[in-house]
Amino acid sequence: MNILISNIGRRGYLVDFLKADRCFDGKVFVSDCDETASGLYGAADQYFVLSRPVDNPEIYIDNLLSLCEKKRVDIVIPVIDPEIPILAKAKERFAEKGIMVLVSNQEVVEICNSKKMMNRFLIENGFELIQTYDTIESFEEARAKSKIDFPVFIKEDFGSASLGAGVVKSMEELRFRFNDGMIIQENVQGEEYGVDIFNDWQLKPVRIVIKKKPAMRSGETDKAITVYDDSILYLSIRLGKTLKHFGPLDCDILKKGEQMFIIDLNPRFGGGYPASHLAGANLLGLLSKLKLNQPIEIDYKAYRDGVLTMKDIGLKSVKVHHA
């Protein structure tokens, strides 16, 4: 079974994980829109430079599908946010050719991509939510009623990599930094956890891995420690059953005492996946069963707890052609 990881960026470790799996006997291809992406130059069988998906989605999909047919790719794994909605819309085109694209349906992707839509989904399904406001006016009204006060936390509705997010300590600063594409939230202090929730082809959770996140870098997990936590496990099972995503979901949960808040959803393998994999949860190894609609046994503790994973700075040098 051949796999293509699209827009791999710096996530060459995904190739290494696949190649190290004794049960995997196919080829691994990688692509990116940047020929200097480090993930192109590693253990992959072949790499390809394609156009940026957002520049012209139709041309990108045509070229990607043509490449997959030529190389007999069985599974496409996207790993960056901007590409996910584009592939979700084109998922059936690939399926007609026998190619599984590892993305959820468009509705799930839209919920995950927009903080406002995510919050609406959480409220409608009875999940606990951090106090959130879409406008300065609604925030001021709540503040006047002593429901919330500074400091607050602002973030982009469609933000990625924590761009624009941060703590705001005064109304003057809020008016300066806030724009219509943002939300304002209570600045809840608690422990942050990253959770990998893997659903099978029937859209039911079969694997869950919980990690404490002591360090982040540019919105991505830099250090993580695997843990067992029943309260987070039950919340994650409920989320997986309710959201009904397909395959991997990278979820961030903030825990304050007995309260637990879902603060971010990414319908893909996230930056914290290496911590899950290196602790024994080989979610990549489940993809062949997912592709063939085969049953996957439920195991919510298919990993070792207390495993600390840290990202290091690796170096590569390759010969390039220049004008």
How would you label these PLM feature ranges?
Residues 1-102:
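ATP-binding N-terminal substructure of ATP-dependent carboxylate-amine bond-forming enzymes
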Residues 5, 27-32, 133, 152-153, ...:
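Short, hydrophobic beta-strand segments that form beta-sheet elements in well-ordered domains
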Residues 36-44, 145-147, 175-178:
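Short loop/helix-cap segments at secondary-structure boundaries that form the rim of catalytic
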Residues 71, 228-323:
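ATP-dependent carboxylate activation and anion-phosphoryl transfer catalytic cores
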Residues 95-164:
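A conserved helix-loop-beta module that forms one wall/lid of the active-site cleft
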Residues 118-123, 184, 236, 287:
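Structural element of the ATP-grasp superfamily
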Residues 163-244, 254-255, 259-261:
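Phosphate-binding site of ATP-dependent enzymes
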